[in-house]
């Protein structure tokens, strides 16, 4: 009986110590459909763009490749939680839901993926993004 409990405890601890998957390598990011990209883009255009285009108020700018690469290593769960609850960073504050209080959880989820999608496109093209 003690062996079983010890075995279950070890499995539990292994499961808890998983390192986050880099967003750029996550299956969800790689499998985003056009509909999901458009959903994320709509939140970007109406809410995220104001701060994350140029780093206003200390926000991470999609033009800062090194910063986005560092953020990507935190994994989706931590970044999504920061969006939902808000956060205080080194250079500024992001309010809960990035001020998109009418956004659904799904819209916010794809806005996180979209901003990394956009940052990737910006880095590949070496051009500034547009809001369409």
Regions found by a protein language model. Name each.
Residues 2-37, 114-132:
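Post-cleavage N-terminal segment of exported redox proteins
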Residues 10, 42-45, 88, 97:
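Processing junctions and N-termini across compartments
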Residues 16, 48-51, 100-103:
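Disulfide-bonded cysteines in secreted/extracellular proteins and peptides
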Residues 20-42, 57-70:
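Electrostatic cytochrome c docking/interface patches
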Residues 35, 39, 63-70, 74-77, ...:
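Surface-exposed, polar/charged faces of alpha-helical domains
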Residues 37, 41, 72, 101-108:
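Solvent-exposed, acidic/flexible segments
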Residues 44-54, 83, 111-115:
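The canonical Cys-X-X-Cys-His
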Residues 82-108, 115-118, 123-132:
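Axial heme c-ligation environment in periplasmic c-type cytochrome domains
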């Amino acid at each position: 009986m003690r062996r079983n409990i010890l075995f279950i405890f070890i499995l539990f601890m292994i499961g808890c110590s998983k390192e986050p998957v880099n967003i750029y390598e996550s299956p969800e990011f790689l499998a985003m459909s056009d509909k999901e990209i458009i959903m994320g883009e709509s939140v970007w255009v109406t809410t995220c763009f104001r701060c994350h285009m140029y780093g206003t108020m200390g926000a991470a700018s999609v033009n800062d490749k090194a910063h986005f690469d560092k953020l990507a290593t935190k994994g989706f769960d931590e970044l999504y939680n920061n969006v939902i609850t808000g956060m205080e960073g080194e250079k500024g504050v992001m309010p809960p839901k990035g001020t998109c209080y009418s956004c659904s959880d799904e819209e916010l989820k794809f806005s996180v993926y979209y901003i990394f999608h956009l940052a990737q496109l910006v880095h590949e093209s070496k051009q500034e993004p547009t809001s369409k």
